[in-house]
Amino acid sequence: MKVYIETMGCAMNSRDSEHLLSELSKLDYKETNDPKIADLILINTCSVREKPERKLFSEIGQFAKIKKPNAKIGVCGCTASHMGADILKKAPSVSFVLGARNVSKISQVIHKEKAVEVAIDYDESAYAFEFFEKKAQIRSLLNISIGCDKKCAYCIVPHTRGKEISIPMDLILKEAEKLANNGTKELMLLGQNVNNYGVRFSSEHAKVDFSDLLDKLSEIQGIERIRFTSPHPLHMNDGFLERFAKNPKVCKSIHMPLQSGSSAVLKMMRRGYSKEWFLNRVERLKALVPEVGISTDIIVGFPNESDKDFEDTMEVLEKVRFDTLYSFIYSPRPFTEAGAWKERVPLEVSYSRLERLQNRHKEILEEKAKLEVGKTHVVLVENRREMDNQIVGFEGRSDTGKFIEVTCKEKRNPGELVKVEIISHSKGRLIAAIKGN
């Protein structure tokens, strides 16, 4: 039998899709890229913003038209968690609904017509699953926690993924070793608040923290690089930043989700820190790792965001000069504090602010790219670049998270670490040549 999976949203959903495949493989399901021949079609959904949620029902309609007569459609993930049986009412072609915390139950629900499994209680089977043998990957995703205990006013995740729980370290290390044996060179650790690891386990566990986990993972032979997402700025204390700086296998790029540069808006968002506190953490980090790459998330148009609040955000953008920016207009979500507020920033104002923010960030990237010319980086080869069946180079990322295109005629295999020198740039893109010894 064949299964087709459509994955929407974040890296956590991508990992959940791997979990679904792992469970279904026990029932002899094989993945296919063609929904027309699938016996089972799964849509793994995102509900962080409204747009992907609207897209879900469009996708269901399209799949219902092209699927085999007896094929089943299942909706999984975060939208499944918060909409539950309402999905079945709105889309009768859906056979079952499976929440984000219930992926391990897929083998049960596919045999139950109109089943709804969306509980967000603790469940070790939500993360303890057999390693899914697949084509070797240079970069692999690895969950270290599930759920979230934060109460950000705009975020639906605690409602869809439940309370935060750390995965036992021995299970993480075992999975990482399997990934390394399967060819993985770079791990991407996943969690809603990865650097809060160790605060709660589902059973008795030795006291450990995120830095302890990073140190243990660094000892695994074959793993060359470790990245993680998404950390919370509140847990970036001096001890964590110092150990982050010292560990040679931990990539010197980090996600620091700002959300807003206004202390007033941050307070309304229930983020737990101020603009000044955030900038202090950045200053400390750059003192330890001057070349660190920093990415961030910014929401514009949050309820009651004034012109002054937005200017504060622009000020932080100028001071930090983020290497990567994920920016969005505020999207009201159900089951959130802010979703019930009546105050709204006019949509045209939000679009104007977003455009200004993104345009300035593009300029910053170009300014930073100019300064990279002549600098040396070590790139993990991800893909070869070919033209007319001839090798023209490769592409990959530096330790600091910079995406680099390398021009060369030599064959370099994915997974190799290669020293390169930046020779030019174009619209923020970095172009390099192999650095001689």
From Swiss-Prot:
Domain MTTase N-terminal intervals? 1-115
Residues annotated for [4Fe-4S] cluster 1 binding in this entry: 10, 46, 78
Report whether 4Fe-4S shows up as a keyword of the record.
yes
Co-factor binding comment: Binds 2 [4Fe-4S] clusters. One cluster is coordinated with 3 cysteines and an exchangeable S-adenosyl-L-methionine.
Q: Which SUPFAM superfamilies match?
A: Radical SAM enzymes
- What sequence ranges are listed for the domain TRAM? 370-436
Entry's EC annotation: 2.8.4.3
* Record keywords: 4Fe-4S, Cytoplasm, Iron, Iron-sulfur, Metal-binding, S-adenosyl-L-methionine, Transferase, tRNA processing
InterPro entries to which the protein is assigned, alphabetical? Elp3/MiaA/NifB-like_rSAM, Methylthiotransferase, Methylthiotransferase_CS, Methylthiotransferase_N, Methylthiotransferase_N_sf, MiaB_methiolase, rSAM, rSAM_horseshoe
Indicate where this protein resides in the cell.
Answer: Cytoplasm
Q: What is its main location?
A: cytoplasm
Essential cofactor(s) = [4Fe-4S] cluster
Name the reaction it catalyses.
N(6)-dimethylallyladenosine(37) in tRNA + (sulfur carrier)-SH + AH2 + 2 S-adenosyl-L-methionine = 2-methylsulfanyl-N(6)-dimethylallyladenosine(37) in tRNA + (sulfur carrier)-H + 5'-deoxyadenosine + L-methionine + A + S-adenosyl-L-homocysteine + 2 H(+)
Q: Which residues of this UniProt protein bind [4Fe-4S] cluster 2? A: 148, 152, 155
SMART domains given for it?
A: Elp3
Q: Which GO terms describe its molecular function?
A: 4 iron, 4 sulfur cluster binding; metal ion binding; N6-isopentenyladenosine methylthiotransferase activity
4Fe-4S as a keyword of this entry, yes or no, is yes
- A GO cellular-component term linked to this record: cytosol
Q: Where is the Radical SAM core domain?
A: 134-367
Q: Which family does it belong to?
A: Belongs to the methylthiotransferase family. MiaB subfamily.
Known function: Catalyzes the methylthiolation of N6-(dimethylallyl)adenosine (i(6)A), leading to the formation of 2-methylthio-N6-(dimethylallyl)adenosine (ms(2)i(6)A) at position 37 in tRNAs that read codons beginning with uridine.
Describe, as the record does, how this protein assembles with itself and its partners: Monomer.
Name of this protein: tRNA-2-methylthio-N(6)-dimethylallyladenosine synthase
| Species for this entry | Helicobacter pylori (strain HPAG1)
Q: What's the source species' lineage?
A: Bacteria, Pseudomonadati, Campylobacterota, Epsilonproteobacteria, Campylobacterales
